[in-house]
Amino acid sequence: MKKHLHKLILFSATACLSACTAQEPLTDYVDPRIGTAHSRWFFFTPAAVPFGMAKLAPTTDGHLGNPNGWEAVGYDSRHTSIEGFANFHEFQVGGVVVAPTVGELQTVPGPLDNPDAGYRSRFDKKDEVARPGYYSVLLKDYGVKAELTATERVGFHRYTFPATEEANLIFNIGTRMGESGPVRDASVTYTDDGRIEGWVVTEPAYVDIYQKGATVTMYFSAVLDAEPTAWGAFSGEQTFAGERSRTGVGAGLYLRFDTRERQQVGLKIGLSYTSVENARLNLEKEAAGKDFDRVRREANDTWEEALGRLRVEGGLHDDRVKFYTGLFHALLGRGLASDVNGAYPANDGMVGQIALDGAGRPVHDYYNTDAIWGAYWNLTQLWSIAYPEHDDDWLARQMVAYQDAGRLGDGIACSKYVSGVGTNFTGLAIAAAYNCGIRNFDVALGYQAARKNELGSEGRPAGAGKLDVGKFVSQGYSPYLPELGMQTTPDGSGFAASHTLEYSFSAYAVAQMARQLGHEADYEQLEKLSGGWELLFDPETKYIRPRDHSGEFIADFDPYAAWAGFQEGNAVQYTYYVPHDIDRLVELVGREEFNNRLDSTFLISRESVFGGGKTINAFAGVHAYYNHGNQPNLHISALFNFSGKPWLSQKWMRTICNEFYGTEEIHGYGYGQDED
């Protein structure tokens, strides 16, 4: 039988829960620094509210990234100097950096191994405070205390300076940051009425892959609570004293202040993806009459309410830290991309407008989003159970994106396609929400979009992913074409076997929506496609085995070989990827062999901490028996519940929670695997 997904969710959701009382501040359990030695650009952003656009954090290595991790890391807890504080942190989006300094003016951050060559400053971990909604640190080289907090669309900075005539604020706008890709243009102006305003145009790597020629633009409008004594512009290392504006790659601005001892200089910076004018509007609507301390309190209260929707009982203090820190990170992602007036960045580069209610407020918000690949193990259930209003917004936003571009996008950065792994589970997410009773969106349009995502191959752009879905629909599986490497075409894929498994699962999900809506012919087609995975089941090895373009199983099959037909994994890991038809998988393998194999998988994998061991590398576990450091088989510890030995699910879930997850900067979400 196939109807086990809800049970999987419950077992997965309760495995690591632990105790707290209603009186305890739940934010005290959150440690944003967990896992920050090997995380992505948007992972460490403590100065933010749930799903906010303004995500403020220090950056220690700009866009250089973690050589043994994934994309740009931004903040690496092993580093000892900070180059500034960025205001935008999102998947494939980053920039607008502010840095306080004292003394001789420098306009480039300098390298990690030589902080004195630029304006970056050393810091000590003991001087850091990172909490939900707040961050502070002492910049040792300058004796400046930096503090950050935020509303949804406004970043608040507060810098406490020593007594000096050379207190500086550096606005580094035209320099590459995070996952944003190369800067194509930038502009910053110190206006006559005392605002600092501008924009930066970037070309993220995934945008270049999935929507070539498109760019992402970030806008800002900032106000200060102190008057500078001097100002100037710069372009890289070249400075222009007294100038109020600069445009181009490397553009920036500096302001100089005469400060008394412990004088605070406050900065409010409104953000937008549509225009400077809307950044200014966001600033006025969200920050008018509010000071730093008030916003910090409000941010903390917002986090308390959000975290408090899930209260847990039993267990140890470290379990509570793991649980609420994980929940904190789940609520940070997929931040706002629309303004207070409902303006949003459309896929074609224009500015779209969300409908307004009778009071002139947008009827929903619009979001950036990392890919949904793997989010169906956790986020989609979390949203529907505890944050249904966000699920509503996310679905409404998907409908807008679909109408704008004609296809669903798995990952979206400023409305541009950033599919990530080149598949697309948005149709599954729409169907899942509908099946959970989340229906405050255009259901007919949602079904049309989901159906097209599962069945539509004609004219499919790269950004919509699933380029090989036509083959899956016509013959029930995607052919493995090893010559493609990591690419996918309409003829097949280098990841054909994992695609077949994934498309089978998503077809099943949309089939359930089709049946509920009375689309019986669609239901029958999708239900049949949901069994496509079985075409790849090899009765000899009892593993999922790729088939070539002629329909034959590939020769010289090695079930432990990673990337050979399987994206970020191997046949040993992916064979369990049949969450919609577990009973049939158990039947094909044989119940006793299934249980023995699965139990042995965990026994062996425990030696490598259920992943890639202690190697700091996002893909360290792709060759392993089991890789809890990546999405494809996060669910398999629950499968004993459907093979007659539920106590083994209890045993291995608890062991994974105790040993794979940690409360340290390196040992957090594994020892160095993919934190997503």
Q: What residue ranges belong to the model's regions?
A:
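Bacterial N-terminal signal peptides that target proteins for export
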Residues: 1-9
